[in-house]
Regions:
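Surface-exposed strand-loop-strand hairpins of Gram-negative outer-membrane beta-barrel proteins
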Residues: 1-18, 340
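Outer-membrane beta-barrel porins/channels
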Residues: 24-360
Length: 360
């Protein structure tokens, strides 16, 4: 709902309607067969790419005069590599490295006033940024009762920590225009980050019975550190962005209908980390949201053609974004006054997912 001193001439009330198609591939295996020990040691990896695998480095960072949502968009390539093992009876630990890319590009060229270049030199490099992920899981019955009949039957708790990560790009260009801009030339430098994930600490508990289980997780995300990260972002450093840490409760349940079909469902309440109504030039939009998810898993123990069991999973998540007011501002000298537009935003997001799992 636009209003203000100089509202934009919008063709519709839709600010953002851009689909994202992410593909994940992963594997888990027991490495104990490679050693003389029978103690299980598990290794796994998961990789994510955008647009069904066609975009390895999907990336976008820009200012916006019409407003842009903070939380949604394409995700660039990432890779998680990790291992896990049982250290004590009923106590499992895991350690993973999350790998993202930090890219650098340097351009040096002579050019004329028409933009024709000569004597070009271009250098592009990308280096990995590695961040830790740690997990701990405790099966109370196995730990305290050795797996026999116990008052703690079906109770498990888990603790995890994921270090912050992002994708960063730096571009530095130097141009010389003979007769206009002599050596050492005009230097243009841009540094920006995208796909930021904060430090996340999660504590969860589940109660399991023969055919069902229910779990509750509290997830603490330290978004306040992002304010300092944006100080070195040449696209967003003027926005004076401030973020708050948030606590997200998640509740989920699973019910096994029969040997083939399992149903799942869950709900989460997520507060926005974005503080304030203004972010100069960038004009970020975000609000609290409620997440509701439903899913089903079909396990085929004797699928046609294949010699091993096959699992097919399907899920749907609906996100309800609450209403919130924002004031759009700009440093553009053509803008008559600030804020030039006040908008009231709300929306929804639908996420469809499917997965195929083979065990062999």
């Amino acid at each position: 709902i636009p209003a203000g001193a100089a509202p934009l001439g919008r063709s519709s009330d839709v600010i953002q309607d851009t689909p994202s198609q992410q593909t994940l591939i992963g594997m888990k295996t027991n490495l104990s067969s490679l050693t003389k020990s029978e103690h299980p040691i598990y290794f796994g990896f998961i990789a994510g790419v955008e647009k069904y695998g066609e975009e390895m480095l999907a990336f976008n960072s820009s200012t916006s005069n019409s407003g842009q949502y903070f939380s949604y968009g394409r995700q660039p390539l990432f890779l998680n590599l990790g291992g896990a093992t049982e250290i004590l009876r009923g106590i499992d630990v895991g350690l993973t490295a999350r790998v993202t890319l930090h890219a650098d590009a340097e351009l040096y060229a002579y050019t004329d006033l028409q933009g024709n270049t000569s004597l070009e030199s271009l250098n592009v490099s990308a280096k990995p940024s590695i961040r830790p992920i740690f997990g701990l899981n405790v099966n109370w019955a196995e730990t305290f009762c050795g797996g026999g009949d116990c008052a703690f039957d079906g109770i498990e708790t888990a603790l995890s920590f994921r270090g912050h990560s992002n994708t960063e790009t730096r571009v530095e260009a130097t141009t010389i225009i003979p007769g206009t801009i002599p050596s050492p030339g005009l230097n243009l430098a841009i540094a920006t980050l995208d796909a930021y994930q904060p430090d996340i600490t999660a504590l969860g508990m589940q109660y399991r019975q023969e055919r069902w289980r229910v779990g509750l997780t509290l997830e603490y995300q330290t978004w306040s550190d992002l304010s300092n990260e944006f100080e070195s972002d040449t696209i967003k450093d003027q926005a004076n962005l401030n973020f708050q840490d948030i606590l997200i409760p998640r509740l989920g349940a699973e019910f096994r209908v029969n040997d083939m079909l399992t149903l799942t469902g869950g709900i989460a309440l997520e507060e926005t980390p974005l503080e304030g109504k203004r972010s100069l030039d960038v004009n970020y939009l975000d609000a609290d949201r409620t997440l509701i998810g439903l899913g089903a898993t079909l396990e085929l123990r004797d699928p046609p053609v294949l010699a091993y069991p096959l699992s097919l999973s399907f899920g749907y998540q609906y996100q309800m974004i609450d209403e919130r007011d924002f004031e759009l501002t700009s440093t553009d000298p053509m803008v008559p006054s600030n804020p030039y537009e006040t908008v009231n935003t709300k929306g929804d997001v639908s996420i469809f997912s499917g997965s195929l799992t083979m065990k062999f």
